[in-house]
Amino acid sequence: MAYHSFLVEPISCHAWNKDRTQIAICPNNHEVHIYEKSGNKWVQVHELKEHNGQVTGIDWAPDSNRIVTCGTDRNAYVWTLKGRTWKPTLVILRINRAARCVRWAPNEKKFAVGSGSRVISICYFEQENDWWVCKHIKKPIRSTVLSLDWHPNSVLLAAGSCDFKCRIFSAYIKEVEERPAPTPWGSKMPFGELMFESSSSCGWVHGVCFSANGSRVAWVSHDSTVCLADADKKMAVATLASETLPLLAVTFITESSLVAAGHDCFPVLFTYDSAAGKLSFGGRLDVPKQSSQRGLTARERFQNLDKKASSEGSAAAGAGLDSLHKNSVSQISVLSGGKAKCSQFCTTGMDGGMSIWDVRSLESALKDLKIV
């Protein structure tokens, strides 16, 4: 486990480049900062400034090396590296509320933006007119779209929203891609087709994620539940009411294992038994370390004033938390190995820090932990 504190401000979202040498983060404002690893330090190398409102989503396309950002100014920008400068291209989303999340499709020919306008904007590049255009998925979304994730085929799109639903839509754009092959979620996939809709959640759906082969989708809700739908089992949904505070992010690390994190400030493991069709709690992944009590240095006292509005000792300042992160974890991303066999994953949080977790090290450190 490696932890780096970038900022005093919260990190609202992040994205990695292809070779994981650079990370783009938003310091909870209208800017995006790109850091590069230099020895044991992270050095800021670029600053992207174009949004007028807070940046709410970042995604970095690995092959085309383009960054897409969205924000509360209701716009998205596609950033292209020309020389040593990132150049933005405005994408008109045709929404009247804040954009909340953005994701490149795996084929990188389009991206999806969820918003408070109760629509999902599917944006693609029109070569003839040399601009980005978008189509809207509207029905039956009834509230803000908080999270998105693409199926590996770049056609199906999972969306979690504030109407307590996780849905899967077809985002097939005939102008830029071939007709999709049938999937376990369905064979007819015209644009905007609803392929799946959950009914088991009772809270805002904060995070959603497809498995590596796309036959399973998992989501976490504000009622502290974790759910998984299996298309190979007639879209049967397994639901687990966790004992944690609400989870904000989730990702598959194998076909049957999930890592989620949120307001408890540490990642937790969930496993899925396909034979029984059940989810189970696999354990906490952040091992608490026993540390001796000591006084605060002047530097720590001022950091606590900035981060936690407290200058008191460890218990009052949140330093008494035995987790690596000292505030809510807002995002999880797979670093290496992919969703099928993840070997490393990354978390960023409201404490302004970033942690890199090694799956094998976690397994050896936690005797009862088994990742299947």
UniProtKB/Swiss-Prot annotation:
This protein's record includes keyword Metal-binding: no
Gene3D superfamilies: YVTN repeat-like/Quinoprotein amine dehydrogenase (2.130.10.10)
A single GO BP: Arp2/3 complex-mediated actin nucleation
Keyword Repeat: yes
Swiss-Prot/TrEMBL keywords: Actin-binding, Cytoplasm, Cytoskeleton, Nucleus, Repeat, WD repeat
Subcellular location(s) per record: Cytoplasm, Cytoskeleton; Nucleus
GO terms for cellular component: Arp2/3 protein complex; cytosol; nucleus
GO molecular function: actin filament binding
Matches recorded under InterPro entries: ARPC1 (IPR017383), WD40/YVTN_repeat-like_dom_sf (IPR015943), WD40_repeat_dom_sf (IPR036322), WD40_rpt (IPR001680)
PROSITE patterns registered for this protein in UniProt: WD_REPEATS_2, WD_REPEATS_REGION
WD repeat placement: 6-45, 50-89, 94-135, 140-179, 242-280, 324-367
Coiled-coil region list: none
Self-association state and partner proteins as the record states: Component of the Arp2/3 complex composed of ACTR2/ARP2, ACTR3/ARP3, ARPC1B/p41-ARC, ARPC2/p34-ARC, ARPC3/p21-ARC, ARPC4/p20-ARC and ARPC5/p16-ARC.
UniProt record similarity statement: Belongs to the WD repeat ARPC1 family.
Physiological role: Component of the Arp2/3 complex, a multiprotein complex that mediates actin polymerization upon stimulation by nucleation-promoting factor (NPF). The Arp2/3 complex mediates the formation of branched actin networks in the cytoplasm, providing the force for cell motility. In addition to its role in the cytoplasmic cytoskeleton, the Arp2/3 complex also promotes actin polymerization in the nucleus, thereby regulating gene transcription and repair of damaged DNA.
Protein name: Actin-related protein 2/3 complex subunit 1B
Organism: Bos taurus
Organism classification: Eukaryota, Metazoa, Chordata, Craniata, Vertebrata
